[in-house]
């Protein structure tokens, strides 16, 4: 092989490799294998800030981030939801993205109270959904579906328990929690979460959507 041929071979090899790395840096998820499935979200029914019932069927076909908070929290919750608002701002115009914020203090957080809280954040109620319900259902969903608290924690004497977590779960269009549980207080994990959302948004939904009591493709 001539020196000229070797030069062109090396040149185009470097060019191809460089092109791949450029794509990887500017396109979240490019070249990444499918994220592992951590759990399947179990059926749930909660009430949102507008007093409407929201179930797992209402969010089929959507990628969403799930978190837990309470409106009277003066510790980590304001920080978490400031960080969450950054995610909201990036994806608020994406039709297949939602945020689900569940209260961990339903005795205090009535529909009116979570509505007031949502309004204070100045967000679209159809994009960032705040949820309340029974303490047992909320805590069971956090532990069994979203893995945001140790699932081994006893569900007995639930009235004496208080779930307070800084973690976020990322759910795909088919109701599966994917890749990892993210620390909502760490900037590097928040950036990772933002990029992982973009990856899941490109994946197809394989389950039938359910909307207004009618199945739709």
Feature map (PLM): residue ranges:
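A short beta-strand-turn-helix
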Residues: 44-63, 88-91
């Amino acid at each position: 092989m001539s020196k000229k041929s070797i030069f062109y071979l090396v040149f185009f090899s470097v060019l191809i490799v460089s092109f791949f790395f450029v794509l990887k840096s500017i396109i979240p998820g490019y070249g990444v294998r499918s994220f592992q499935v951590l759990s399947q979200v179990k059926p749930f029914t909660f009430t949102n800030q507008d007093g409407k019932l929201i179930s797992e069927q209402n969010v089929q076909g959507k990628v969403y981030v799930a978190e837990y908070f309470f409106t009277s929290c003066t510790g980590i919750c304001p920080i978490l939801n400031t960080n969450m608002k950054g995610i909201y701002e990036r994806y608020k115009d994406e039709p297949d993205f939602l945020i689900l914020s569940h209260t961990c203090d339903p005795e205090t957080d009535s529909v009116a109270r979570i509505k007031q809280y949502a309004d204070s954040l100045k967000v679209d109620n159809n994009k960032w959904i705040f949820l309340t319900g029974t303490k047992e259902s909320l805590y069971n969903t956090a532990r069994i579906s979203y893995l945001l608290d140790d699932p081994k924690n006893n569900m007995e004497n639930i009235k004496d328990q208080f779930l307070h977590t800084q973690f976020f779960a990322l759910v795909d269009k088919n109701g599966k929690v994917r890749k990892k549980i993210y620390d909502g207080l760490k900037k590097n994990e928040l950036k990772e979460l933002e990029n992982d959302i973009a990856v899941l948004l490109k994946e197809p939904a394989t389950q039938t959507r359910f909307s207004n009591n009618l199945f739709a493709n």
